[in-house]
């Protein structure tokens, strides 16, 4: 048997639709197409987004695995229609098309000048394509809409099974000074989503907007850093027993698998490497209900397991590789020097990246929860969680009393 919870996406950027399939979700989780649409609308947010976000509406259809707003326990398939499909149905048709029709289509012009930083070059060589179109269609960040759809189901499960909330905020765009204050809570999410750059701090927001404006004026693009916070996790998701069971490794792999993400850190991450051990770890003290800590430098993970503290995951997104002023490249058809192709793109997609990272973190946490607690229905999973929490409380009882 494979992993207890699996997901896969299908579809191209300008194809008929994107599809997400989530297998292994328990029965009884409340989820609707409206829930998914709301999360997809959050993905379209952000200052610096391109023209596509102004008309793409992400028409959601739940095809299977849900009945009357409740999951059934079988594979869940979600389709997200592409608004522009009528313009592309000849160029992106799955069945053969009359070559004369394709020859008359400007949209079918060969794309032979790969963009530095994109999948174009390696994809053309790896798969034997003379044209970058088949590469960029699947490599496009448009695919992340399907991940957000699957992640919406995962976050609903986490909320209903554990009371866990997953949220994100942008902490830096380009060279703007990163936000280093306390992380936001669930009540802060509406204000974050109302921010043009999904920033928690107003001063940081203004600096980020200024960076985007400057890049847009210069015909350039920007990356940045987002932080995802998960609140309410129990102790013990993940394991120390082998590398592939460590939750930090699973989270890093899932987040690094998002288009344009080039770095991941848990908690204070790289800053911890510059500290002495006495200043790097989160000391523990007896408290009213068990062990308490005054810091969370580890970001909620120790030894590959959740430790009951808020989970903090940061992801670094590189600048978008479709640069308006075009970078130097080689025309793969002629071998001549050239400038890279320019497809319609964003100046900055960091605010949207936070929503995508939320989705991937939620999927990994949902999988870890099901691996730990099992169950075929939400009610059964909850019973298992309740029993585990009682057992943990008993083990923590000496610390709760302040005794050895």
Curated annotation (Swiss-Prot):
The UniProt GO MF terms for this protein read: chorismate synthase activity; FMN binding
What this protein is reported to do is described as: This reaction introduces a second double bond into the aromatic ring system.
Binding residues for FMN: 138-140, 259-260, 303, 318-322, 344
Respond yes or no to whether keyword Amino-acid biosynthesis is given for this record: yes
Q: Which domain of life is it from?
A: Bacteria
What is its quaternary makeup?
Homotetramer.
Cofactor(s) the protein needs: FMNH2
Q: Per the UniProt entry, what are the Gene Ontology biological process annotations, in alphabetical order?
A: amino acid biosynthetic process; aromatic amino acid family biosynthetic process; chorismate biosynthetic process
- Where NADP(+) binds, per the record, is at 43, 49
Gene transcribed to yield this protein? aroC
InterPro entries reported for this sequence: Chorismate_synth (IPR000453), Chorismate_synth_AroC_sf (IPR035904), Chorismate_synthase_CS (IPR020541)
What's the EC number here? Answer: 4.2.3.5
Q: Name one GO cellular component term.
A: cytosol
Give the family, as the similarity comment puts it: Belongs to the chorismate synthase family.
The chemistry this enzyme catalyses reads: 5-O-(1-carboxyvinyl)-3-phosphoshikimate = chorismate + phosphate
Per UniProt, which keywords does this protein have?
Amino-acid biosynthesis, Aromatic amino acid biosynthesis, FAD, Flavoprotein, FMN, Lyase, NADP
Its name, as the record gives it, is: Chorismate synthase
Which pathway is recorded for this entry?
Metabolic intermediate biosynthesis; chorismate biosynthesis; chorismate from D-erythrose 4-phosphate and phosphoenolpyruvate: step 7/7
Q: PROSITE patterns, from UniProt?
A: CHORISMATE_SYNTHASE_1, CHORISMATE_SYNTHASE_2, CHORISMATE_SYNTHASE_3
How is the cofactor bound, in the record's words? Reduced FMN (FMNH(2)).
Which species? Mycolicibacterium paratuberculosis (strain ATCC BAA-968 / K-10)
